[in-house]
Amino acid sequence: MKYLFKKIEPKWQAKWEEAKVFEAKDNSDKPKFYGLVEFPYPSGAGMHVGHIKAYSSLEVISRKRRMEGYNVLFPIGFDAFGLPTENYAVKTGTHPRIITDENIKRFSNQLKKVGFSFDWNRVIDTTDEDYYKWTQWIFLKMFEKGLVFRDRTLVNYCPHCKVVLSNEDSQGGKCDICHSDVVQKSKDVWYLRITQYADKLLEGLKDVDYPDNVKQQQIHWIGKSKGAFVNFDVDGIDEKLEIYTTRPDTLFGVTFMVIAPEHPIIDKYADKITNMDEITAYRNECAKKTEFERTQLVKDKTGVRIQGLEGINPVNGKKIPIYIADYVMMGYGTGAIMAVPAHDQRDYDFAKKFGIDIIEVIKGGDISKEAYTGDGEMVNSDFLNGYAKKKDSIERMLEELEKKGIGKAGVQYKMKDWAFNRQRYWGEPIPLIHCPNCGVVAVPEEELPLRLPDVKDFEPGEDGQSPLAKIDSFVNCTCPKCGAAAKRETDTMPQWAGSSWYFLRYTDPHNANALADMDKLKYWMPVDWYNGGMEHVTRHMIYSRFWHHFLYDLGVVNTPEPYAKRSIQGLILGPDGDKMSKSKGNVVDPLDIVEEYGADTLRTYVLFMGDYGAATPWSENSVKGCKKFLDRVAGLTDILSEESVSDELEMKLHRTIKKVSSDIENLKFNTAIASLMTLINEITAEGHLSKDDLTIFIKLLSPFAPHICEEIWEFIGGEGLLAVSEWPKYDEGKTIAKTVEIGVQVNGKVRGTIVIPNGCEKEKAFEIAKADERIASFLEGKNLIKEIYVPNKIVNFVAK
């Protein structure tokens, strides 16, 4: 047989679809397996090889699970709201709906050409009204429970996309969407109180099977710290500045304070500040900087002392200067910090620049050269002097703070509440109404979905308002509470909204009355295995875990955690070893590979190219190597025989079953495929194999290269579809060689080798060794003093 991929691949894709072999059943008696991949954003560029790698791991696992007798849910959908589509719509004048539908159709066809075993009956699209009705419903439940609030604050704003970005979407001072520079802008922002779930998100990590680096990234992102809130009086006025510190034991070393340029105390007491012009000029400069620019550790320290306001150190009563500096943000902590320059390098650099006192309170370093950040004995600290353990000194200081009413133990999180609105058209409308009498009111549930109006102008306003603000028929409404004339919220949700619960909808995608039926949720949830990219383990995974915990508290879902297990794929790099990008001209189109070499070749190569979790460069020669391997697989039909294979080959066959089965579960796809390549060499060397042995081989290969394996299965008369046949089982006894080759030593020197039965008794081993002509020649004419046998390893004769 020949590997005629252009003929057989569409043939088997049609047969799978006709037989509905990949459709999950909601009422099966089989054990369930829910495998999930991160659903794609359907861009105009279509699918790239990164998608193939991302989906291939659970494609292989899901195909194996079906053959193991599981009822498998392996769904796909499209995360289709978002700015790239809207920006393209603005550029071309084409409605985002049309663009999205075309892109989804193209993407679906591409995925089908590769032969992925997705359940196409459960496809979801986050832009579908029947889907985003439930996204809006979840949002309203959060609003109802007080998890939604609005605040006017400085936000990260992308002038190019004309949209507010969360901290997560503007890392490095760049827009995550268009990569242009982000600026700070004062705006009204809707937030979700994700910080209320910080502890649950941390605790939940104990109950899931995530790689350690994924857990650590989430722990770091949430950034829980234990410390103290401490009040500093401001001299001469009835005002306190609250700070948060993880090192309250260093309070005696506080020699100045720094507050954010936006801190309200500045405007409140402007008449007492004698250098207000200087302060105002500095604040104006800060307003031009992004948060990233302001908080960089490696930069020149800038700041201005507030003349006319001084703080008072609460533990020693000393007056200390107050500065404003750009590195302190109102959105972090309390907007004010205490500075201990002897033991914090940034404070040290600031103090050196502005000539501020530096007081050592922890022995161990040379503060004339740099800050000492290690542990040591407390000094210059009154009642803490002599304490050597940080834990003890912190506890003692907390006692003092609480006794005097000037501070208390507290917890802070690096993670901030989630900025949840965008000033663009192509997103879920936020279902809230602004009433002059009732304030902010929820759209009644029976009126959901609140549909996006059909518009021709998608351009956001220069004033930072959403395109929806220009549509009077959408904006103007009546208050559902009092009937007064009111206005709808015109911002839309971020793209992260739809992806925060999509895995639930797959369990019941056509339900008009609930986001999913509870019985179906109880059957399918949690997701057994979720694979995706490292770039999504913080934002998307934390957001979706937050939503899921909330729905669990609400009684809508049956498990606190959505994903039982998580795995990560590495990048596919260009042939030059660089990250693939159009600008570098090193992008590989997967459909070009399908056209030239076949889908099975593409599937096999993507998993053979290297460690699944590592970044690996593309190699056209290795693609050709995988094609040759599949050509050889097809050729196995030409050496079918009634004759049994040798014991040696039977052993290698059972070892391969064991290895491939294990390697798949451990994501060692490259070594699984390599073992099949080795086995085909052994089979070819033997010159023949039986139908039963060929069946085992193609079953092991089928999750990787299902089309050619189905074709061979049909050729040899297999019943039904190979995709749902039984996964091979190995016989442990047959994985053990019947004979072993061992070395024979005479007086400590290896003189030859012998073949003995596996597990051979020592007397038999000695007998075989002595019967060997070469060994016998070294023993001839000598007296045996000692005979030594290490089972299955070596025979040693000591002779004189």
Where are the regions a protein language model picked out?
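Conserved oxyanion/phosphate-binding beta-strand-loop segments in alpha/beta enzyme cores
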Residues: M1-L36, R66-P75, I99-R106, Y282-Y323, ...
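Residue patterns forming the tRNA-binding/recognition surfaces of aminoacyl-tRNA synthetases
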Residues: K2, K11, K15-A19, K91-L241, ...
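NTP-handling and nucleic-acid-processing catalytic cores
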Residues: Y3, I8-Q13, V49, W134-I358, ...
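N-terminal catalytic cores of NTP/NDP-binding nucleotidyl/phosphoryl-transfer enzymes
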Residues: K25-P96, V123-I138, T245-T246, N313-F350, ...
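Glycine- and acidic
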Residues: E38-M47, D119-I124, M329-I337, V379-F383, ...
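Secondary-structure transition/capping motifs at alpha-helix termini
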Residues: R63-N71, K91-R97, N109, K113-S117, ...
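Helix-rich, typically C-terminal accessory recognition domains appended to large enzymatic cores
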Residues: D79, E144-H160, T250, A409-C438, ...
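Alpha-helical recognition segments enriched in aromatics with Gly/Pro capping
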Residues: L309-Y332, V361, V475-A614
